[in-house]
Amino acid sequence: RTSRSITKKPINKEIAKVEANLFCKLKKIVAMSHKDKLLLEQMNYKGVIEVADLGVQKVGEVLNGIPIEEVVDKFKDRKNLIFFGYMKRAENHWSIIWFIFFVFLKIRKQNPHIHLWILGLAPRPLLKLIGKCISNVHVAGAVSDPTLAFQKADLSVAPLLYGAGVKIKVLQMLEAGATVVATEVGAEGIESHKKLHIVNKTQFGKKILELLD
């Protein structure tokens, strides 16, 4: 994050030094992507670096969340899109709001049966209000385990506009067998996959309609 912030750039080199010193104390590191592996090598890490296999990462299980079956039961006779993430994070919150107003409302006009399900902890009040005011937008909040929703929905989406690093949720979607439409930010660091469609944000809605057709 510091490398992308104008105000924090001056301390970026110092942070990199601290990270490199910490890494040198480790004999082995499991990286989330080949991109992360390359970054470690560029930092002169001399230990063993392994890249985690697709599917070993898993996030989103919440013991007191809504049973995912309650969400999936409502999928019948609809075209369903899934967005999943920790909704308190700014990049998730603002990216899905952008998606709703600049993509979803447009594609809903062409296909009134499209529904958007937003899963994940701590949705902000603004997002909850949008979910109440805009038809076909469902802000479910925390769920027991999103995997079944990934499997049963027509598409999963990762329309992230900013944020750094590999998105474990996208790896989890793919492992569940979902077809995923993502921006370059949403797919950052993820190896090519036959079910991962990476598009410019201006083409996001077009790709969704194409895949649903």
Q: Which role fits each region the language model picked out?
A:
Residues 169-172, 179-183:
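Short hydrophobic beta-strand element within catalytic cores of glycosyltransferases
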Residues 8-16, 20, 24-71:
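Donor nucleotide-sugar binding/catalytic pocket of nucleotide-sugar-dependent glycosyltransferases
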Residues 27, 151-165, 176-179:
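Acidic donor-binding loop of glycosyltransferase active sites
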Residues 194-213:
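C-terminal "capping" alpha-helix adjacent to the active site of nucleotide-linked donor transferases
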Residues 184-198:
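Short acidic/histidine- and often glycine-rich active-site loop of Leloir-type glycosyltransferases
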Residues 42, 52-135, 139-151:
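Conserved catalytic-core segment of nucleotide-activated headgroup transferases in glycan assembly
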Residues 35-39, 123-124, 186-187:
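Alpha-helix capping/helix-boundary segments
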Residues 1-17, 76, 185:
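Acceptor-binding helix/loop patch of EC 2.4 sugar-transfer enzymes
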